[in-house]
Amino acid sequence: DGTISIGNNAGKNVTSADGSTFVGSGAGASVTTGGKNTAIGYSAGNSTTTAEESVFVGYFAGYNATGSSGAGVAIGSQAGREQKIGSSVYIGRMVGYKHDGSADYAGGNNIGLGHQTMYGIKRGAAGNIAIGRSAGGALDGHDVSNEASWNVFLGYNAGRHVTSGSYNVAIGSHYAGGAMYNLKDGNQNVAIGYNAFQGDGSDGQKPELNVMIGGGAGGGGSLMKTPSHNVGIGYLA
């Protein structure tokens, strides 16, 4: 069937996973059916039973990914661990790792790249792009259609604490707070610049249809009290 297994218990339970490659101790050890998988690394893809056309590379990458993890990619130590990876791409250490032990998996079509990017994404959050360390690290779809979905976060800590907002674009890096760093909710906002439209971390605020461009633009102050249809351009605008 063209399956290659190298390592202690690698692919040991395979019954019909044609064209798969399992390399490393415990790699793909629980895969039974579903072909064309690649699992390389200690326990990569382990406890994943019916994945198909998926790629898991790294220590515990794709470990315990669910049965519908078809055509997903998880590369990096613990990338995509405990996650429903279907059609998503997680690259980097702990990217897309759903670490709370629940069965509240993320939706599909997410792209995460960077150290702990999308760390903890869950409950149906789908179609997001997060690039940069800790970007998009709290996305929680609450199993509601289009919640915590279709966001773009680019930069270190961009959108770090956004939980349920959708259709947002945040571009900007900062070690203590990237664009939309402390904003928990809100839809169709654009923030460009370090610390732009940070929010103050409080619950109940739901800004919509704002554009903030510039370092610190929008901030967490007065604009957050009138959160819709604002435009701010310039440093601390």
Question: How would you label these PLM feature ranges?
Answer:
Residues 1-237:
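Glycine- and small/polar-enriched repetitive beta-structure motifs of secreted/surface proteins
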